[in-house]
Amino acid sequence: MKFIVKLYPEIMIKSKPVRMRFTKMLESNIRNVLKKIDEDAKVQRQWDKIMVKVPKDKPELTELFAERLAHIPGIHHVLQVAEYDFETVDDIYQLALPVYRDMLKDKTFCVRVKRAGQHDFNSIEVERYVGGGLNQFTEAKGVQLKNPDVTIQLEIDRDKLYMVSQRIEGLGGFPIAAQEDVLSLISGGFDSGVASFQFIKKGSRTHYCFFNLGGAQHEIGVKQVAYHLWKTYGESHKVKFVSVPFEEVVTEILERIENGQMGVVLKRMMMRAATRVAERMGIQALVTGESLGQVSSQTLTNLNVIDRSTDLLILRPLISMDKPDIIREARRIGTEDFAASMPEYCGVISQRPTVKAVLSKVEAEEQKFSEDLLDRVLAKAEVIDIRDIAVATSERVTETETVSSAAGNEVIIDIRAPEEEESRPLDVDGVEVKVIPFFKLATAFAELDKDKTYLLYCERGVMSKLQALYLQEQGYNNVKVYRP
């Protein structure tokens, strides 16, 4: 069994040198992917297509090869074919008759032929000859050129005949490495996953940068998204996953920055950190999942202010997409379930965000940061080969106990941001309630009575769980999540 890989039309219209270069890249990418399935896979480049051969003694690999080819960027469609030698048009008919005789019983059909090479016949003559013979010597209802029950597809290349048994639609785009590398800021949500996919499809080797706002569970979830995107669509090339611990930055923002500027300042700090990561990796562009007007930091004014934090090009492929369209695309590429279960954070952004940030005012606020804040944060960044994530995703984060009521000997810790706690204070009869914002909990917890059990509370229950997981990782087992 063979596959004929058809190049994406945008590759076909390139100049001869560019087309040849892209075709070589695609051949190499296909080989890299299929060799991981079976070392005996054969991949051969031709001028207008790429031939892939399934090992004769391993027909069971046919379906797997087809599935992998459908997810490699740069492919328009794939034809699953059987190959035959022939000399005359009658040979073609004689080869087609036993293959299609039973298939055509009581059905209308037509024959479509594509031909390359020097022959004493043309494609239409083959269609007429083969179609006439099949109509006469099978139990078909007859020939029907428009909307037939069966379309017989034949491809002729010099002295080879290919009978098409299946057409598989490809991903489109350009082969990976056709464009320069990019660094995608990934959060695990709908937007960043789709944005990352768009650049994989466009031919960029897409690396991932994750800003960890607290908790192993969130990081493992984001790693799963990145690994899925790489394994499904970009496996032909090695990429990096960079995890930057950003809790310290969030703490300083919440303690020092004016409330309305917090969201824009956080994004600017992320861009600065990502820029330094990208420069170390020799990457000249960042990718984000921002969409115009989706949240307060994504107005034109605020995006302009955010862009001023870096000299690198910031690419936003989803800038004009609506959220339902983004979710549909996430569903199509397989990241929807990951994104739907990804944590949201309580109080990480401001309660009264500005939609028209003023650059001078934002820069003045940023002067309040510790001088070496980003240096300290980036010194703790973890850079791993994405292939190693498979090991990490097999690990299970300890399940944190969640309770709906508190006993008199337990202490509730309200970890909400100060604005939330002040506007909706928590009061539980007969139970002590301490107020420790989540961004101070890691250091403050060490000073608490170790003989007591502490129940962490936030309105959504996500940050409290992540903080409990973090404390458990530090060796504290007297922690639960409080969800009244």
Swiss-Prot record:
SMART domains: THUMP. ATP binds at residues 185-186, 267, 289, 298. GO terms for molecular function: ATP binding; CCA tRNA nucleotidyltransferase activity; tRNA binding; tRNA-uracil-4 sulfurtransferase activity. Pathway: Cofactor biosynthesis; thiamine diphosphate biosynthesis. One of its GO terms (biological process) is thiamine diphosphate biosynthetic process. InterPro entries: Rhodanese-like_dom, Rhodanese-like_dom_sf, Rossmann-like_a/b/a_fold, ThiI_AANH, ThiI_fer, ThiI_N, THII_Thiazole_biosynth_dom, THUMP_dom. Belongs to the ThiI family. Catalyzes the ATP-dependent transfer of a sulfur to tRNA to produce 4-thiouridine in position 8 of tRNAs, which functions as a near-UV photosensor. Also catalyzes the transfer of sulfur to the sulfur carrier protein ThiS, forming ThiS-thiocarboxylate. This is a step in the synthesis of thiazole, in the thiamine biosynthesis pathway. The sulfur is donated as persulfide by IscS. This is tRNA sulfurtransferase. The gene is thiI.
